[in-house]
Each structure stands twice: as C-alpha cells, then as structure tokens.
C-alpha cells in the first residue's frame, strides 16, 4: 500500500510501464498489474486523471514480429480507459517514420528512446495531457505564464 504515495493535489498522472515484463508475462498479466496501479491511483488521488500510455514498439519497425505481443498488450491497456478518469494514448506510431521503420536516431538500441524520440513522444502526448489539466496556467503572448 505504501508503494504508491500520492496526494490530492495531483491533477494527472502518466503511466508508461510494462515493456520490461513483455518477455516473461502474458498481455493479460501485464494489463492486470497496470489495472491494479490505476485502481491505487484512483483510491489515493481521487481527483487525478490517469493517462495510460501504450507500450512503445521494439525493433527496427512498428510491424516487427517482436511487436505482436506489444500490440496485444496495448489493446488490453486501451480497454482500461473509461474516458472519465482513465485515458489511453498510443504514442508508438509517432516514433516511426512514414514507412513504419524506427530510426536509430529515435531508438538507438531498438528499445530506449533518444532525444529525438522524447521530442516526438512529447509532441504526441501534449494535446491529450493538456486536455486533462484544466487548471494549468495559460501562456501570454510574451511567453510568460498568466496566473489565471
């Protein structure tokens, strides 16, 4: 119970977990563990929105056979979303090139993202996350934050 320490000031929480389990556990087992974490967040931070991210693809291309299990897992993670407090987003496609390949600049080891991958991830996630944060300060034309 003390594993997840949250307070009521959290507006949103992003979960990206499960890739390290993909080799040893079934999609159902991994999704079940993530569902337990989502429930813990709901109990400890009842006002927080939870954005569950799809597990990123592995290998040199999005349609690489290694990703079959990841696609199955992501389908189960999508089912966790209720559209009220729990949301799902798959940013994996944003990491791929138009032909479906994943460049070494984005994922040098076919698993971990590098700076170009982080930038794509951020851009893909930004609109959804902004929609979950109704109380965030607005930008002014000078680029400074307007407190309200």
Which residues fall in each region the model found?
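Oxyanion-hole/transition-state-stabilizing segment in secreted/luminal serine hydrolases
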Residues: 1-35, 40, 51, 55-61
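N-terminal cationic-hydrophobic initiation segments that often serve targeting/anchoring roles
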Residues: 4, 41-42, 78-81
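Hydrophobic alpha-helical packing residues
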Residues: 34-37, 41, 76-77, 125
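A short helix->loop->beta-strand "cap" motif at the edges of active sites that frequently abuts
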Residues: 45-49
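Catalytic His-Asp segment of secreted/periplasmic serine-dependent ester chemistry enzymes
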Residues: 57-148
């Amino acid at each position: 119970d003390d594993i997840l320490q949250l307070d009521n000031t959290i507006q949103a929480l992003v979960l990206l977990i499960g890739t390290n389990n993909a080799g040893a556990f079934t999609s159902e087992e991994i999704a079940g563990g993530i569902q337990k974490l989502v429930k813990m967040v709901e109990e400890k931070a009842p006002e927080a929105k939870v954005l569950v991210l799809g597990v990123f693809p592995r290998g040199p291309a999005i349609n690489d056979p290694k990703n079959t299990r990841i696609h199955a897992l992501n389908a189960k993670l999508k089912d966790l979303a209720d559209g009220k407090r729990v949301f799902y987003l798959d940013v994996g496609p944003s990491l791929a090139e138009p032909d479906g390949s994943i460049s070494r600049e984005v994922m040098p080891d076919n698993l971990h993202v590098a700076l170009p991958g982080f930038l794509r991830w951020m851009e893909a996630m930004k609109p959804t996350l902004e929609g979950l944060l109704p109380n965030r300060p607005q930008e002014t034309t000078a680029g400074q934050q307007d407190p309200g």
